[in-house]
Structure formats: structure tokens, C-alpha cells
Swiss-Prot record:
GO terms for molecular function: structural constituent of ribosome. HAMAP family: Ribosomal_bL33. Keywords: Ribonucleoprotein, Ribosomal protein. It comes from the Bacteria. One of its GO terms (cellular component) is cytosolic large ribosomal subunit. PROSITE patterns: RIBOSOMAL_L33 (PS00582). Pfam families: Ribosomal_L33. InterPro entries: Ribosomal_bL33, Ribosomal_bL33_CS, Ribosomal_bL33_sf, Ribosomal_zn-bd. One of its GO terms (biological process) is translation. This is Large ribosomal subunit protein bL33. Belongs to the bacterial ribosomal protein bL33 family.
């Protein structure tokens, strides 16, 4: 089953992306390098829960 997740910026800007993932095939937490428009750089985004 696909579940909604929140990718939070590690730069500490508070910026986040929302996406979904298949919990059965990827049970561990996702870490992806994406663009943060606040600092205008590519930074690591870590998975967090949607509140």
C-alpha cells in the first residue's frame, strides 16, 4: 500500500516536499538530494511524517 510521506529539508529552512512511497518495497526511510528554493541549493531531504 502506498503511503503519503513528507520530505523535510536538512538545511533547516522548514521547506518540504510531499510524495508517496510503497512501504512494502522500501521499508527504510528515504533520503533524496533535491533543490531547496529558500537557500537556492541542492540539499538532502529526509523522510518525515505528515501531520
Amino acid at each position: 500500500m502506498r503511503e503519503l510521506i513528507r520530505l523535510v529539508s536538512s538545511a533547516g529552512t522548514g521547506h518540504f516536499y510531499t510524495t508517496d512511497k510503497n512501504k512494502r518495497t522500501t521499508p527504510d526511510k528515504i533520503e533524496i538530494k533535491k533543490f531547496d528554493p529558500v537557500v537556492r541549493k541542492h540539499v538532502i531531504y529526509k523522510e518525515g511524517k505528515i501531520k
